[in-house]
């Protein structure tokens, strides 16, 4: 009796093995019994929501980004030509009356001109001998000079007056984000442009998204491409900065593409300043897996911007056939965009091999059970 039980043990083990093989690999989550909120477009046809384009040399050429060319900026030139600094509260002015040193406070060895100058009060005035308070806020230096000269003429014959700014403290622009030295920059009598501000901030960091710099002026945002400005000389991207302007250089976290499928290293890749081509993306993923990939099925899935895309389409899909290695020439010229998904499909033989690998334990278990049953029957 004991021997019979011992011989039944392999059969029981086989049955256990088979029952284990009925569990498919991977986790599962059933929606049965759960409150499923059905959407209005739940019955969508995904095939009708995408456009598929086989890559050809002509299509690659059509998709190539048009290079920015050098452009002048006549409006900026006019702004700079007519630019005049207007005094604000906190500025320090130096007033010199020639041949009347008693009206001029000289800067000594241990005192700078900003220490000895005339500070503009919060109410917009400054004090000057003989004439008392002088309203200076919002005025140019020539307007202030003319006002002081006219009022001093009551006390001094033909006064020769000179006015300059010893310290610019009232007006600032702010540079933040991915620059080497963020902070505030003074608005002075020298016009400050976007390019000047970036250079004064020590340039961009490696994490900067120089294509989507944001300038906030009077509560409104403008997008500026420093790539077009600095790399291609497109001066139309340059702007004159005014008091209170904020120049923000964002991180390039959104400049990424995804490489998935039958590659040696599925990856999320970040674009650098020069962008990324399809060949570079595949190379950074250590290439396609030659044993499992379908070289004719390399796809770039490009989401269409905006709700529903164009005409209800959500993505354009570009297919590259790399069965012929010379097609890599097209891949080298095909430039990726942020959030592109590069997907390499599986070869049919690889799918078959994976199916066989999943079935082998079951087949072996059935065979083992059959052999065991035969042994028991003969016993």
UniProtKB/Swiss-Prot annotation:
Residues anchoring lipid (N-palmitoyl cysteine): 21
Signal peptide: 1-20
SS bonds (residue pairs): none
Pathway(s) served: Glycan metabolism; exopolysaccharide biosynthesis
Taxonomic superkingdom: Bacteria
Keywords per UniProt: Cell outer membrane, Exopolysaccharide synthesis, Ion transport, Lipoprotein, Membrane, Palmitate, Polysaccharide transport, Porin, Signal, Sugar transport, Transmembrane, Transmembrane beta strand, Transport
Membrane topology of this protein: Multi-pass membrane protein
Single GO biological process annotation from the record: polysaccharide biosynthetic process
Entry's localization field: Cell outer membrane
Lipidated residues (S-diacylglycerol cysteine): 21
Record bears the keyword Signal: yes
Pfam families named in the record: Poly_export, SLBB_2, Wza_C
InterPro entries: Poly_export, Poly_export_N, SLBB_dom, Wza_C
Entry GO MF terms: polysaccharide transmembrane transporter activity; porin activity
GO cellular component, one term: cell outer membrane
Family classification: Belongs to the BexD/CtrA/VexA family.
Function according to Swiss-Prot or TrEMBL: Probably involved in the export of the extracellular polysaccharide colanic acid from the cell to medium.
Protein name: Putative polysaccharide export protein wza
Protein's organism: Salmonella typhimurium (strain LT2 / SGSC1412 / ATCC 700720)
């Amino acid at each position: 009796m004991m021997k019979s039980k011992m011989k039944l043990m392999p059969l029981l083990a086989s049955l256990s093995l088979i029952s284990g093989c009925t569990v498919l690999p991977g986790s599962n989550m059933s929606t049965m019994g759960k409150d499923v909120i059905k959407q209005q477009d739940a019955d969508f046809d995904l095939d009708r929501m995408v456009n598929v384009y086989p890559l050809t040399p002509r299509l690659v050429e059509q998709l190539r980004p048009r290079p920015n060319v050098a452009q002048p900026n006549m409006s900026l030139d006019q702004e700079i030509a007519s630019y005049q600094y207007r005094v604000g509260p906190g500025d320090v002015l130096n007033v010199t009356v020639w041949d009347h040193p008693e009206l001029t406070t000289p800067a000594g060895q241990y005192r700078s001109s900003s220490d000895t100058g005339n500070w503009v009060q919060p109410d917009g005035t400054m004090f000057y001998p003989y004439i008392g308070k002088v309203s200076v806020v919002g005025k140019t230096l020539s307007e202030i000079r003319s006002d002081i000269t006219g009022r001093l003429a009551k006390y001094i014959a033909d006064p020769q007056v000179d006015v300059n700014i010893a310290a610019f403290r009232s007006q600032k622009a702010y540079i933040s984000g991915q620059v080497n030295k963020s902070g505030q920059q003074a608005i002075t009598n020298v016009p400050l442009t976007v390019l000047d501000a970036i250079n004064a901030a020590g340039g961009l960091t490696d994490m900067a998204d120089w294509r989507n710099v944001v300038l906030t002026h009077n509560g409104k945002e403008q997008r500026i491409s420093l790539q077009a400005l600095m790399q291609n000389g497109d001066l139309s991207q340059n702007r004159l900065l005014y008091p209170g302007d904020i120049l923000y250089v964002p991180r390039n976290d959104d400049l990424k593409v995804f490489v998935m499928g039958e590659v040696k290293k599925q990856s999320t890749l970040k674009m650098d300043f020069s962008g990324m081509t399809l060949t570079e993306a595949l190379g950074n993923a250590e290439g396609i897996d030659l044993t499992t990939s379908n070289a004719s099925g390399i796809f770039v899935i490009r989401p269409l911007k905006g709700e529903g895309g164009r005409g209800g389409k959500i993505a354009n899909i570009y297919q590259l056939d790399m069965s012929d290695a010379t097609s890599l020439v097209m891949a080298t010229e095909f430039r990726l965009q942020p959030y592109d998904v590069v997907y390499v499909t599986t070869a049919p033989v690889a799918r078959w091999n994976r199916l066989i690998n999943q079935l082998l334990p079951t087949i072996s278990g059935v065979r083992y059970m059959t052999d065991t049953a035969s042994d028991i029957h003969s016993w």
